[in-house]
Every structure is written in structure tokens, then in C-alpha cells.
């Protein structure tokens, strides 16, 4: 709801060209990162819910135009090799076995700064929490186009694959926090085509 108005506002905040992106491409990143209430209606929440669903093939067609614009923007940004951090307010150790490879089908928001995750609006410092320490090679720095520049957000693309290297508890004083170390790997087949082609490869399987 209200997406057209928010898209108009996003374009108004992207009046200068950066990173060779057009105004519309920059605005797509701005709109993707925008927050509003209720949170479950934010564009990035709804879109990622579709991308991560079992029946994404049936649900994704209405998103094709926006996805092509957003992916065109992200493919123009330089891919960065770095260690990034992602936080989830759950204990996910049982879902990630050491040595196994996992595919993330949604856009994955990460940060360069671990201190950002410690803020209350993200992971906080209480309750069950999992931090992912991710050695990635195609992180996209979107700060110049984000609606919240202070977060230093790094976006990982759909279809990214990771091997679980280890997990550990960083402090006995905080038994609810665990860190899972992931290393990004190249999948055996292309799972995400450049936006000049079909957005998703026909090889994408259903589910995880």
C-alpha cells in the first residue's frame, strides 16, 4: 500500500547520479531500504518473503519490473570482498551444520560494523541471538543510495551460497549469543542471471 507515493518520495531523494546509476535505479535501492509502519508491509519485508517462499515461481511475477530495476542498480555497483555481519534474534545453530552449503534466496542485509548490530533496533544485547560473520566476495555497498546511510549496509544478492566454517560462543558472560562463520562460495550453476537476461535462472529449485 502507498508504494506509488513512496516511490515518488524516493525519486525526490535521488536527484544526483552516483555510481553510474540512473535516478530510477538509485530510487529503487532507496525504496528497498525504506522503513514504515507496520513493518510487515515494508517493501523489503514483503519482497524477501516472496523470494524465500517455497512457491516463489508462482509469487514472483508481479515483482519482475521492480526486481529488474533493483538488480540493474546492484549489478552496476562494484562487488566487494570483505567480512560482513548479519544478525538474527534467534538461536540458529541447529539450522546450520558445519561443512554444509546453504543458499540464501532473499536479499540479505549486512553491515561492515558489528557495533551496528548491537543497537536495540537490530540485534540488541539481550535474548537469543545469532551473528553471522560472512566472508563474502560480492557484497554491494549501498550506503550512497540507502534511505538510512548511517547503517553502512552491505547487500548480498539472492542465490548467494555459503559454507559453514564454524560456530562459537564469544563470551561465557553472554550465553545467548552465538556467532556462525560463513564463507561465500561459487555455486556450480548460475542462480541469478544479470538483469539484461531473465532475472532468475531456470535452474533455480524450489524451497531452500
Spans of features found by a protein language model:
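Internal glycine-rich, Lys/Arg-flanked active-site/core loops of soluble domains
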Residues: 2-143
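Intrinsically disordered, low-complexity linker and terminal regions at domain boundaries
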Residues: 198-207
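Active-site and NAD+-binding cores of ADP-ribose-processing enzymes
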Residues: 89, 101, 109-196
Amino acid at each position: 500500500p502507498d508504494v506509488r507515493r513512496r516511490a515518488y518520495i524516493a525519486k525526490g531523494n535521488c536527484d544526483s547520479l552516483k555510481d553510474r546509476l540512473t535516478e530510477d535505479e538509485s530510487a529503487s535501492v532507496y525504496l528497498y531500504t525504506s522503513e514504515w509502519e507496520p513493518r510487515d508491509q515494508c517493501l523489503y519485508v514483503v519482497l524477501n518473503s516472496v523470494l524465500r517462499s517455497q512457491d516463489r515461481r508462482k509469487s514472483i511475477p508481479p515483482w519482475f519490473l521492480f526486481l529488474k530495476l533493483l538488480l540493474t542498480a546492484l549489478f552496476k555497483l562494484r562487488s566487494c570482498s570483505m567480512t560482513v555481519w548479519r544478525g538474527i534474534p534467534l538461536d540458529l545453530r541447529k539450522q546450520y551444520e558445519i561443512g554444509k552449503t546453504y543458499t540464501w534466496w532473499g536479499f540479505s542485509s549486512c553491515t561492515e560494523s558489528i557495533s551496528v548490530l548491537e543497537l536495540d533496533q537490530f540485534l540488541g544485547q539481550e535474548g537469543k541471538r545469532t551473528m553471522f560473520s560472512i566472508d563474502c566476495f560480492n557484497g554491494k555497498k549501498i550506503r550512497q543510495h540507502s534511505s538510512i546511510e548511517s547503517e553502512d549496509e552491505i547487500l548480498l544478492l539472492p542465490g548467494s551460497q555459503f559454507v559453514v566454517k564454524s560456530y562459537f560462543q564469544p563470551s561465557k558472560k553472554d550465553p545467548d549469543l552465538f556467532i556462525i562463520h560463513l564463507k561465500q562460495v561459487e555455486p556450480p550453476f548460475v542462480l541469478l542471471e544479470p538483469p539484461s537476461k531473465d532475472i532468475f535462472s531456470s535452474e533455480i529449485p524450489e524451497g531452500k
